[in-house]
């Protein structure tokens, strides 16, 4: 506290020498005593606070400086919730035109703003307005401390909207371009703190922050790069912002791709997350590939950092959605690394993104499908199908359903004993998993020239294909009933005598088909009658709901009739 004590001594500067009132002399004497033994005093109440407040309200500039410096040192060492009586004199000092006082007062307020309760109270007491004024100062130290305080205040959710609407964003954006690295770090950190809600992100974009953030991606300072990449990643969450970015920031993607190779792990991760968010849009999905992003991402999904692996596999998952990217991703060598990611049993998010990407790639060309099988993806997915979390099972079942659509994949899947996984998956309590698995099973029963694997699995595992059909026929869920009926029709249309015999001889299957035939005939009749009445009442216009219900019932009824022709 040497600086503070020296300021409490008499100054020889004529401009600051004013008569000192008796109460001020007493305050100086008391304060010196308190500071000598400061660990034993509470400076936020009683005598110490009274002495400081007396100096704050003095007309003597030296005494005001002493108070400001004392507050700066005390608040740096002792941070806790304080009341209005403590903040009020600091806010008074903040309005001073003296740079020394401004620097110390901003520092004191910034120190106290580490505490959440203080953050709220500072803003409630009008602390933003003088801080904004100090940000406009020509003094770099004043700028740095004022922005640092705003940065701390902006970490409190209750304050963010108030800061966004206070007029602080424009000067913050201006200071982000400062040549002083400390000011720049504080300003970009404050801008980052303002990107955690959609409304605040809009205010930030409107304040012109985006071009500044993009330009600073090329900064040589890792902290500034991190703040800017993270802020842009958050801004890119919003579709409207992504549209603006695509129209105004042509170099954004190439800069982010470069940063995915940054020596700083956190910059690398945030750049990848920013690309992932941008890749929610089809235009960016193509642009990232054109900018050379694949060669970086294929390395990242094989690195040892779980956050980086997660960010990169989420990014490639979004990129793989675009059909034009599928072949390029396969050619870039992603298949085997993606299959290896399925071993992340302690991170279902990584597994989900990996399977989802594999599903997108498997659905493309014959060449990609062949490489998919050769990569070991089917076997690995089969191993995980019954033991992974529901979210992963959902992706795996969807992947199987897509693969089973291709005629030239069906026998390969059956030879891989895929039914060992698919049939038990139809038992899942999760409708999406059960439905996807059933759809895959139905597709595998359609248009194949060898039904040996289907026949072998008629009763096993888990009561086999037969058990699946009975459960779905009796599910009273139209989608599942439709899948079961369509599967039976495909099996019958194969004209395989063994298959026909297995279905005809199963009384429960035949009984369930007849029941669905009767129910859907009756439902179609009722829907048709309602349809006619509604036409009469409404003068020809009909509610679409009754019409759709009639069509659905008719479709199920028609399938049952086609099946009955085979059975009779």
UniProtKB/Swiss-Prot annotation:
Matching SMART domains: ARM
Location(s) in or outside the cell: Vacuole membrane
One Pfam family named in its UniProt record: Arm
Lipidation (N-myristoyl glycine): 2
ARM repeat positions: 37-74, 75-114, 116-155, 157-196, 198-237, 241-280, 282-321, 323-363, 407-446
Molecular function as annotated in GO: identical protein binding; protein-membrane adaptor activity
Protein name as annotated: Vacuolar protein 8
Its job: Functions in both vacuole inheritance and protein targeting from the cytoplasm to vacuole.
A GO CC term attached to the entry: Myo2p-Vac17p-Vac8p transport complex
UniProt topology in membrane: Lipid-anchor
Protein family: Belongs to the beta-catenin family.
One GO term (biological process): ribophagy
Primary site of residence: membrane
Residues covalently joined to lipid (S-palmitoyl cysteine): 4-5, 7
InterPro entries recorded: ARM-like, ARM-type_fold, Armadillo, Vac8
Origin: domain of life: Eukaryota
PANTHER family: VACUOLAR PROTEIN 8
Keywords: Lipoprotein, Membrane, Myristate, Palmitate, Repeat, Vacuole
């Amino acid at each position: 506290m040497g600086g503070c004590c020296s300021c409490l001594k008499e100054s020889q500067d004529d401009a600051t020498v004013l008569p000192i009132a008796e109460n001020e002399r007493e305050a100086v004497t008391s304060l010196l005593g308190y500071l000598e033994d400061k660990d034993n005093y509470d400076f936020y109440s009683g005598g110490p606070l009274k002495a400081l407040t007396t100096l704050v309200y003095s007309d003597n500039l030296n005494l005001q400086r002493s108070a400001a410096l004392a507050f700066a040192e005390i608040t740096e060492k002792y941070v806790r919730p304080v009341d209005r009586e403590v903040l009020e004199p600091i806010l008074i000092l903040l309005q001073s035109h003296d740079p020394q006082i401004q620097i110390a007062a901003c520092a004191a307020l910034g120190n106290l703003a580490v505490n959440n309760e203080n953050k709220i109270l500072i803003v409630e007491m009008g602390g933003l307005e003088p801080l904004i004024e100090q940000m406009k100062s020509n003094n770099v130290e004043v700028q740095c401390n004022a922005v640092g305080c705003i940065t701390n205040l902006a970490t409190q959710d209750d304050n963010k909207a108030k800061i966004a609407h206070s007029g602080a964003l424009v000067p913050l954006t201006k200071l982000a371009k400062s040549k002083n690295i400390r000011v720049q770090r504080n300003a970009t950190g404050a801008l980052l703190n303002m990107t955690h809600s959609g409304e605040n992100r809009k205010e930030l974009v409107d304040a012109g922050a985006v071009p500044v953030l993009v330009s600073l991606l090329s900064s040589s300072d890792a902290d500034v790069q991190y703040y800017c990449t993270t802020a842009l990643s958050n801004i890119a969450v919003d579709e409207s912002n992504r549209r603006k970015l695509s129209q105004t920031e042509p170099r954004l993607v190439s800069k982010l791709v470069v940063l995915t190779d940054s020596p700083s792990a956190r910059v690398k991760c945030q750049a990848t997350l920013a690309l992932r968010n941008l890749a929610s849009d089809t235009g960016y999905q193509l642009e990232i590939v054109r900018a050379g992003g694949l060669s970086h991402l294929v390395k990242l999904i094989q690195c040892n950092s779980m956050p980086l692996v997660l960010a990169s596999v989420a990014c490639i998952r979004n990129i793989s959605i675009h059909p034009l990217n599928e072949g390029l991703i396969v050619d870039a060598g992603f298949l085997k690394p993606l299959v290896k990611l399925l071993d992340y049993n302690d991170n279902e998010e990584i597994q989900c993104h990996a399977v989802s990407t594999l599903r997108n790639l498997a659905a493309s060309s014959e060449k990609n499908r062949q490489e998919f099988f050769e990569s070991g993806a089917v076997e690995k997915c089969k191993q995980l199908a019954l033991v992974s979390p529901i979210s992963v099972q959902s992706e795996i079942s969807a992947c199987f359903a897509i693969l089973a659509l291709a005629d030239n994949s069906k026998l390969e899947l059956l030879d891989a004993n895929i039914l060992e996984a698919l049939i038990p998956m139809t038992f899942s309590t999760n409708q999406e998993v059960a439905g996807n698995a059933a759809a895959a099973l139905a597709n595998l029963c359609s248009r194949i020239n060898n039904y040996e694997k289907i026949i072998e699995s008629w009763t096993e595992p888990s009561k086999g294909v037969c058990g699946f059909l009975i459960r779905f026929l009796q599910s009273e869920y139209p989608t599942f009933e439709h899948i079961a009926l369509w599967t039976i029709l495909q099996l019958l249309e194969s004209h395989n005598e063994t298959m026909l015999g297995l279905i005809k001889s199963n009384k429960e299957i035949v009984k369930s088909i007849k029941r669905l035939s009767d129910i859907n005939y009756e439902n179609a009749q009722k829907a048709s009658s309602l349809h006619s009445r509604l036409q009469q009442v409404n003068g020809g216009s009909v509610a679409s709901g009754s019409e759709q219900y009639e069509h659905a019932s008719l479709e199920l009824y028609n399938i049952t009739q086609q099946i009955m022709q085979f059975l009779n």
